[in-house]
Structures are given as C-alpha cells and as structure tokens.
Amino acid sequence: MPTPKKGARLGGSASHQKKILSNLAASLFEHGAIKTTDAKAKALRPYAEKLITKAKSGSVADRRNVLALVPNKEIVAYLFNELAPKFENRPGGYTRIIKLENRKGDNAPMSQISLVLEETVSAEASRATRASASKKAAEEAETEEVVEAPAEETATEEAAEEK
C-alpha cells in the first residue's frame, strides 16, 4: 500500500484531490491549455503526463485505466485517437507550465498549463546545424585572417618607407 502524500492536499481530502486532478486533466485534454493556480498546475503535470504515456501505448487495458481516472468517454477517445499520435515521437515533457500574474481577488499565484504540440527538433538535426554553423564560422575566420594579413604587411611597409 503506497504511503499517503505528506502536506496539504488540494481540496482538503484525498478523494477531493483525485476528483480535482481528474477534472483538470479532462479540461486540459479538451482545451489544450488551462489557467489555474501554481499548486494545481504542478500537481496536474505528472498526472496528465502519465495519462498521455498510457494513451501512447493504446492498449485496451490502458484505455480502461485512463477511463477509470478520467470518467469522460469523449475526452478519453480524443486522448487516445487524436492526441496520442501527436506525441508519438516525444519521449516525455508533454506539458508546459507558464507563470502568470497573481489572481486579483486573493493574490494567489496563477499559471497556465498547456500541452506541447510542437514538433521537437531531433538531436541529429541540431547537431547538423551546429556543425554547419561551426564550419561557416571557421570559413569566415579564415577569410578574415587572409584579408587582415596583407593589411598588416602594408602597414609595416608604409612604416619602413617613412623611416
């Protein structure tokens, strides 16, 4: 049996916290981004990412597990059929938390948690761009050296002529 989480819970009780996270995850999958408090966003991130990882596998058992946690068939179907294929090449980090201004009424710290749907740049592509950039920089440095070398010689020649 897992040990209970220490500290304050969202909503007061364990069952209320589970429902809050379930509803926040459903809203996140439905809208793509939601605005909530920092504490809820930080608690939602691992919860939602585990659901997306289960959706990526696509097995019937995982679908039933997700349906037990998010009791909305339409959202679970959307998660498995449309969102999971978008995250197929991404090994993790499906969500992003952006800090916002504090809430006006009670000055609570607010955040926007959103799904990261942009394509990731592979390590090979970034390595290739870095290599090409370093080659260009090396070529530019060589051309600058070639241009600077005659200029220095002419300066020393002019100094010799003046003497």
Swiss-Prot record:
GO cellular component terms attached to this protein's record: cytosolic large ribosomal subunit
Biased composition, class Low complexity, residue ranges: 123-135
Region (Disordered): 123-163
Signal sequence residues: none
Tree of life domain: Bacteria
Gene3D superfamilies reported for this sequence: Ribosomal protein L17
UniProt biased composition (Acidic residues): 140-163
Biological process (GO), any one: translation
Keyword Transmembrane helix carried by entry: no
Annotated keywords: Ribonucleoprotein, Ribosomal protein
KW Ribonucleoprotein (keyword) present: yes
Gene Ontology MF terms: structural constituent of ribosome
Similarity-based family: Belongs to the bacterial ribosomal protein bL17 family.
Complex formation: Part of the 50S ribosomal subunit. Contacts protein L32.
NCBIfam families associated with the record: L17 (TIGR00059)
Protein name (Swiss-Prot/TrEMBL): Large ribosomal subunit protein bL17
